[in-house]
Amino acid sequence: MRKLRCEWEKTLEGAANRGVKQRAYDALRGLQQCRFEGGDRVSVSTSHARTGYSPEAVAEHAMALAMAVNRHLHKAYMRVRENNFSLQGLTGMNFYGKTAGIVGTGKIGAAMARICHGFGMKVIAYDMYQSPDLDFVTYVELDELLATSDLISLHCPLMESTHHMINIDTINKMKDGVILVNTSRGGLVKTDDLIAGIRERKFFGVGLDVYEEETQNVYTRTARMTS
C-alpha cells in the first residue's frame, strides 16, 4: 500500500507542476482509495466525477456473485473442464421464498432489493433513511437482519460508523449457512474475522468484489481458500 501511495504522490506532484488544479474520480470509486500523504503538499483538490454509472449493473453483479456462490458455479466450471460431470457437492438452495437482507438502500441497494424481490425472496433492509419507493421492503434493525437473512448484500458507504461493520460479533449473529455478498467497500468487512468465519464454516459461501487490503490478503493468505 505504501508503494502505491508513493506512485500516486509522484503522479500528483507531476500533475501539479504542470498546472493541474483538480482531480476527479468516477463515482464508483470511494475517495478513501485515493487518499495519500502527498495531497497535503500540493494544491490539487479531489472530487467525484458524477458520471452516468449504472446502479442496476452493480446490483446485477452482486446477484451474479450470489448465484455463483449458491450454485457453486466456479466448482462446476472447473469440473466440466476436466470432463467431470458429477453433481456431488454442487447442490445449492432455491432463493425463492428465502430472505434477502439488504444493508443500505441507496440506488444500488434499491436495485438489488428489486432483483431479490423478482426472485420471489422476502426482502428486508437496514438503513438510517427508509426509501418510500420500496414498498415491498420491510426495514428492520441490523441485528434482526443478520439473524434472519439467508442472503446478506452490503450496499453502504465506508464511513467511521460502518468501518468493519462485518466483524466477529456481527458474523456470530448471522444464521448458519448464510451467503454474504460485498460489492460496496472492502473496509466494511474485517478481513481476519471473515476468514475465521469461513474456516469455521459459518457461511454457505461469500462473494466479494472488493477487499480491505488487496495486496496483503487476496493473493497470499486467501489464495487457497476457494471452495
Feature names for model-found ranges:
Residues D26-A27, S45-S54, D127, S184:
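Short beta->alpha connector loops at strand-helix junctions that form conserved
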Residues R5-C6, L28, D150, C156-L158, ...:
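Short glycine-/small-residue-rich Rossmann-like dinucleotide-binding loops
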Residues K21-R23, R41-T46, D135-L142, R224-S227:
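Active-site regions of enzymes building and remodeling cell-envelope glycoconjugates
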Residues E13-R18, C34-R41, M128-F136, N217-A223:
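Short loop/helix-cap segments at secondary-structure boundaries that form the rim of catalytic
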Residues M1-S47, A147, N167:
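An N-terminal-biased, well-structured beta-alpha scaffold segment characteristic
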Residues Q88-D176:
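Rossmann-like dinucleotide/phosphate-binding beta-alpha-beta segment
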Residues S47-H48, I168, G177-S227:
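Rossmann-like dinucleotide-binding domain for NAD(H)/NADP(H)
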Residues H48-T99, A111-R114, G118:
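Phosphate-binding beta-alpha-beta segment of Rossmann-like dinucleotide-binding domains, i.e.
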